[in-house]
């Protein structure tokens, strides 16, 4: 599964935006405990820099907000790949259990769920329906770290 996952990301055209997992403060980009992989909230960071900043519905338009989501979920999936490359455990199965999307939006914004659909769709494309379908939360926020428009975190089962 370890090399298959990375090959699948490449074959599906999932861009790798950073050479290694990134954390912007005193935390780990991911944590593995008891067969569960917790991916810290990912911002739309490309080559170590925030690609977009501002509020969705104001400075950030629909296309840019969708791009933010795809960058965040790509960063999540590449963090999973990095974990798989560095673990010594034998892994047979990876499933996405939960996805949480936080959106820095103007007050009247209502399409949080539609934005998070972009992330859910990519995860299902990579893992398949059986292992990719997940529970999730999409929520609007008054602000996010670094004035990021989007932050997404994920939880995976690793068996």
Locations of regions flagged by a protein language model:
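N-terminal presequence-like segments and the immediate start of the first folded domain
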Residues: 1-97, 105-159
């Amino acid at each position: 599964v370890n090399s298959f996952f990375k090959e699948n990301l490449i074959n599906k055209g999932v861009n790798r935006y950073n050479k290694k997992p990134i954390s912007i403060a005193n935390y780990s980009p991911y944590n593995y405990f008891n067969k569960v992989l917790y991916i810290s909230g990912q911002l739309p960071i490309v080559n170590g820099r925030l690609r977009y900043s501002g509020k969705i519905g104001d400075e950030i338009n629909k296309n840019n907000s969708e791009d933010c989501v795809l960058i965040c979920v790509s960063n999540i999936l590449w963090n999973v790949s990095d974990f798989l490359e560095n673990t010594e455990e034998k892994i047979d199965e990876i499933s996405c259990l939960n996805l949480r999307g936080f959106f820095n939006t103007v007050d009247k914004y209502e399409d949080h769920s539609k934005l998070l659909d972009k992330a859910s769709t990519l995860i299902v494309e990579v893992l398949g329906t059986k292992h990719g379908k997940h529970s999730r939360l999409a929520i609007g926020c008054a602000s996010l770290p670094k004035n990021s428009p989007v932050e997404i975190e994920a939880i995976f089962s690793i068996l």
